[in-house]
């Protein structure tokens, strides 16, 4: 009788332990997923400027110099201003960017990153203190090694001349393309770059 009760007690304890572990496993899995839930703004800051947690996810493919500039006091101030402008000018954009990334669709991501560059140019045109330059720069200009759509924001200096200060931040989209081809305009290369970006974010 005692041995039966003991066995029953052990079975009960093991059952409780197993269900507890399963519960903890689900909880930790959910927490991990929640930790990788980002807003459209998080994606924007991370992919274009290497800021925040998204920036850290793709940090191995970032140019340290540009990340430093983007995360400087001046850089953060400039990016904050850009984000504020976009939210006012195109309130739906950040949600659209998030949807394109969450859907893991490279083509949609390409569309939204191209739109991001257009919005940044629009911001620069409306801001007297900031200039936008589309000049191509060296192959080490930012994310993934070569610029697809090179763009820099410059804070206007005292003499109203566009200067490349610590606040000059790259708006280039996929430089990863160089690893596949010398042609940055090739659609298949752009899709490969977008797919790599999505993989890094969703790993």
From Swiss-Prot:
Impact upon substituting residue 30 to H: Reduced amounts of pro-SdpC produced, no proSdpC is secreted, decreased amounts of SdpI expressed, decreased toxicity
Induction: By Spo0A during nutrient starvation, through its direct negative control of AbrB. Repressed by AbrB during regular growth when nutrients are plentiful, in association with the transcriptional repressor Abh. Protein not detected during exponential growth, accumulates during stationary phase (at protein level).
PTM: Production of active SDP (able to induce SdpI and kill cells) is a multi-step process that requires signal peptide cleavage (probably by SipS or SipT) as well as SdpA and SdpB. The disulfide bond is not required for maximum toxicity.
GO molecular function: toxin activity
Chief subcellular location: secreted
Keyword annotations of the record: Antibiotic, Antimicrobial, Bacteriocin, Disulfide bond, Secreted, Signal, Toxin, Virulence
Phenotype upon loss of function: When the sdpA-sdpB-sdpC operon is deleted, increased rate of spore formation; a double operon deletion (sdpA-sdpC plus skfA-skfH) makes spores even faster. In a single gene deletion no SDP is produced.
A biological-process GO annotation: killing of cells of another organism
GO cellular component: extracellular region
Pro-peptide positions on chain: 33-140, 183-203
Signal peptide region: 1-32
Entry's localization field: Secreted
Keyword Cell membrane: no
InterPro entries, per database record: SdpC-like
Self-association state and partner proteins as the record states: Proprotein probably interacts with chaperone CsaA.
NCBIfam families per the UniProt record, alphabetical: toxin_SdpC
Function: Produces a 42-residue extracellular sporulation delaying protein (SDP) that collapses the proton motive force (probably both the membrane potential and pH gradient) across the cell membrane, which leads to autolysis; may form a proton channel. Induces the lysis of other B.subtilis cells that have not entered the sporulation pathway, inducing cannibalism to provide a source of nutrients to support sporulation, and at the same time delaying commitment to the energetically expensive and irreversible onset of sporulation.
Name listed for the protein in its UniProt record: Sporulation delaying protein C
Organism: Bacillus subtilis (strain 168)
Organismal lineage: Bacteria, Bacillati, Bacillota, Bacilli, Bacillales
């Amino acid at each position: 009788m005692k041995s039966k009760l003991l066995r029953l007690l052990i079975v009960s304890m093991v059952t409780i332990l197993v269900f507890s572990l399963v519960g903890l496993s689900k909880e930790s899995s959910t927490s991990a997923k929640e930790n990788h839930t980002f807003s459209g703004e998080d994606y924007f800051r991370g992919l274009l400027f290497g800021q925040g947690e998204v920036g850290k996810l793709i940090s191995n493919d970032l140019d340290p110099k540009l990340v430093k500039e983007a995360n400087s006091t001046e850089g953060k101030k400039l990016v904050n201003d850009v984000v504020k402008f976009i939210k006012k000018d195109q309130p739906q954009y950040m949600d659209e960017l998030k949807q394109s990334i969450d859907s893991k669709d490279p083509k949609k991501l390409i569309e939204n990153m191209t739109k991001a560059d257009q919005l940044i140019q629009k911001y620069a045109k409306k801001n007297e203190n900031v200039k936008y330059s589309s000049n191509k720069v060296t192959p080490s200009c930012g994310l993934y090694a070569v610029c697809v759509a090179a763009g820099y924001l410059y804070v206007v200096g005292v003499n109203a001349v566009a200067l490349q200060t610590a606040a000059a931040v790259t708006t280039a989209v996929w430089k990863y393309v160089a690893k596949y081809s010398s042609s940055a305009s090739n659609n298949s290369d752009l899709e490969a770059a977008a797919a790599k970006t999505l993989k890094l974010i969703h790993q």
